[in-house]
Amino acid sequence: MRVSNQGSAETVWLVLDDAWEFNEPLSFEVPKRVEALESGPSLRYITSQRMIERFCAEFGEIFRPFILFGSGDFHHLTALFIRQMKEPFVILSFDNHPDWVVGPVHWSCGGWVNRALENPLVQQVAVWGCGNFECGFPWRLRGNRSACRSGRLWVAPWRSEKNDYPDWLHPISTADWRTAFIRFIESIRTSAIYVTVDLDCLAESDAVTNWENGRFLLADLDWAINFLRKKARIIGGDLSGAFSPTRYASWFQSVAGRLDHPRQRSVTDRKRRSINLRALEVVWPILTQA
């Protein structure tokens, strides 16, 4: 493990892949860099409890309240990062996918919400901005419907003419989502919120990711996180979702990953990094501000 000396004491950049490069002046302070490239392939997309605990034993001491990491293929690490929290809190996720799949693979980017709900301090997980097919029928049958029905998991997908959503989902539209968001935040019983941002919640114009893009614009995230800061305490958070070339440690990860991932759109490396860096320069400062 190699650690740089730069960055705020409250932030860290966990380098698991090649999603980010900071070779030019930026409008924010780059977090302390922690090299974890050797661990990346074994953790990517799906992994085991053994690998999770090994990773936590090696890197847990460098976790900070706010963590920048790479592809959304690593989003399940959020369920690990929140172990730092010491008080009851709500997780608010901006994501184009519900990440709620109940299945035999215990640790995966598509099911991390269930691991987070196992944490006794997590009062609720709310996922805003799901636009892919997983909330539609029959794919939603793979989701954690019991948690949705109990209210412990709140999923707000974008409305679609193709989908007739059940009453345990909370559909939104571009015209009304801010009103719904305000109402939801004002209903939360605790003031402590952990915010996790997957850049795939953004439209194609605002992010290049390994997954399908959503409908939010950067201005939407700017508004939402600033609103949160007025109404609640952001006690921690993370940001992932930037595209990176896939590297897996096992054939099973490779086969499953290739079957599950969408076809990547053609974008030059230079344009990809430029688009994602612009997103980071907007979201990271407002997420991590004191």
Question: Language-model segments: which ranges?
Answer:
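Short, solvent-exposed loop/turn segments at secondary-structure boundaries
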Residues: 102-107, 208-210
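Long, hydrophobic, well-ordered secondary-structure blocks that form the structural core
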Residues: 91-103, 112
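Short acidic (Asp/Glu) patches
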Residues: 74-75, 106-113
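Catalytic cores of soluble, metal-dependent hydrolases
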Residues: 2-69, 73-90, 121-122, 126, ...
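Conserved acidic E/D residue at the C-terminus of a beta-strand in Rossmann-like folds
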Residues: 95, 129-131
